[in-house]
């Protein structure tokens, strides 16, 4: 036996039924669609839900786009920094070790909610203006790192 002599087993392959090819063919006249009605005539259009308000109308239009270059910061408020039991320079690695930011390597931004009662020496990727003012007013230092 050679490769070109291979054939499927007898009875394992049936020819496709050709509908609408005369009454004698067994699937003539209505071609298995029954009589009358929307589904007997043509196709129901894509997205049609039987008269119910379809999903694409219920959701409304989505506008705009997602900026693939958007920088998403891990944020920490100065009030949390003030509570840290740490005296050295506060860096993103220090914040990760205290579990104030996640371990995902995202840049860290310091925001200005809370009070600063002691001089803080902070290094971060970004600062809000209110956070910068509060840290400097308490005698601390602010350094933007890249």
Swiss-Prot record:
PROSITE patterns: RIBOSOMAL_L15 (PS00475). One of its GO terms (biological process) is translation. GO terms for molecular function: rRNA binding; structural constituent of ribosome. One of its GO terms (cellular component) is cytosolic large ribosomal subunit. Residues 23-35 have a biased composition (Gly residues). Residues 1-51 are annotated as: Disordered. The keyword Glycoprotein does not apply. Keywords: Ribonucleoprotein, Ribosomal protein, RNA-binding, rRNA-binding. It comes from the Bacteria. InterPro entries: Ribosomal_uL15 (IPR030878), Ribosomal_uL15/eL18 (IPR021131), Ribosomal_uL15/eL18_sf (IPR036227), Ribosomal_uL15_bac-type (IPR005749), Ribosomal_uL15_CS (IPR001196). Part of the 50S ribosomal subunit. Belongs to the universal ribosomal protein uL15 family. Binds to the 23S rRNA. NCBIfam families: rplO_bact. This is Large ribosomal subunit protein uL15. It comes from Thermomicrobium roseum (strain ATCC 27502 / DSM 5159 / P-2).
């Amino acid at each position: 036996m050679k490769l070109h002599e291979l054939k499927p087993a007898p009875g394992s392959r049936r020819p496709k039924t050709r509908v609408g090819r005369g009454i004698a063919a067994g699937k003539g006249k209505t071609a298995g669609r029954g009589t009358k009605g929307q589904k007997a005539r043509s196709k129901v259009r894509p997205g049609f839900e039987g008269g119910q308000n379809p999903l694409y109308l219920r959701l409304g239009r989505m506008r705009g786009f997602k900026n693939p270059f958007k920088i998403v910061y891990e944020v920490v408020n100065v009030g949390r920094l003030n509570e840290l039991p740490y005296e050295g320079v506060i860096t993103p690695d220090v914040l990760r070790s205290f579990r104030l930011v996640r371990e995902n390597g995202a840049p860290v931004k310091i925001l200005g909610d809370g009070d600063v009662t002691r001089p803080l020496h902070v290094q971060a990727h970004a600062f809000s203006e209110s956070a910068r003012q509060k840290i400097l007013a308490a005698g601390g230092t602010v350094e933007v790192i890249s």
